[in-house]
Design a protein with these regions (language model features):
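Conserved SAM-binding loop of SAM-dependent methyltransferases across substrates and taxa
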Residues: 80-88
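Conserved class I S-adenosyl-L-methionine
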Residues: 69-75
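S-adenosyl-L-methionine
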Residues: 100-130
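Conserved small/polar residues in nucleotide/adenosyl-binding loops
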Residues: 167-168
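A basic, amphipathic helix-loop patch mediating RNA/tRNA/ribosome contacts
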Residues: 1-36
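A short glycine-rich, Lys/Arg-flanked "PGG" loop and its adjoining helix->strand segment in the class I
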Residues: 150-159
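A short, conserved alpha-helix within the catalytic core of class I
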Residues: 143-151
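Short beta-strand element of Class I
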Residues: 91-94
Length: 169
């Protein structure tokens, strides 16, 4: 297809750059005819998912950088934050998620990424990592930050920095 993954296609639709027969598409599940004219207009989001845009914005607004650092993406899913970290100089990213089979293929095959799928962050310890984390991101919705921060403190360096995107359901 035109787009490398469903998540990427959904991200482009939500970004408002997908048009079908000259009409902007705003629903990812919308059915279209096989002979429809599909176009992607404007700029690609640049990451495997919209999550990368969230972290990019945080790095523009706050003095945060993964450059030259060992990082962790907590709640990695498709890997938008992971992708953003790598594109901004991360030397390694531990991509942690309780789900599996979600991380984009380009990240799964990147030697700088340690795919920790089927892993609950509450169970991660420093001895599971080759080195402590210097930069981390959190993008979760089904676990309280109350459970995440003690783990983050235990696996990070004293001067580690992070960005948190949280949706309380």
């Amino acid at each position: 297809g035109m787009i490398q993954s469903r998540e990427r296609a959904k991200a482009l639709i939500m970004a408002g750059v997908v048009f079908v027969n000259e009409q902007k598409v705003d629903k990812a599940g919308e059915m279209i005819k096989e002979d429809a004219k599909v176009e992607v207009r404007g700029h690609d989001i640049g990451y495997v998912s919209r999550g990368g845009l969230k972290l990019e914005k945080a790095m523009q607004c706050f003095p945060l950088t993964p450059n030259g650092k060992v990082c962790m993406d907590i709640g990695a899913s498709t890997g938008g934050f992971t992708d953003c970290m790598l594109q901004n100089g991360a030397v390694k990213v531990y991509a942690v998620d309780v789900g599996y089979g979600q991380l984009a293929w380009s990240l799964r095959t990147d030697e700088r990424v340690v795919n920790m799928e089927r892993t609950n962050i509450r169970n991660v310890t420093l001895d599971m990592l080759a080195e402590p984390i210097e930069f981390f991101s959190v993008d979760v919705s089904f676990i309280s930050l109350h459970h995440i921060f003690p783990v983050a403190q235990a696996i990070t360096t004293p001067d580690a920095m992070g960005a948190v995107s949280y949706t309380h359901l």
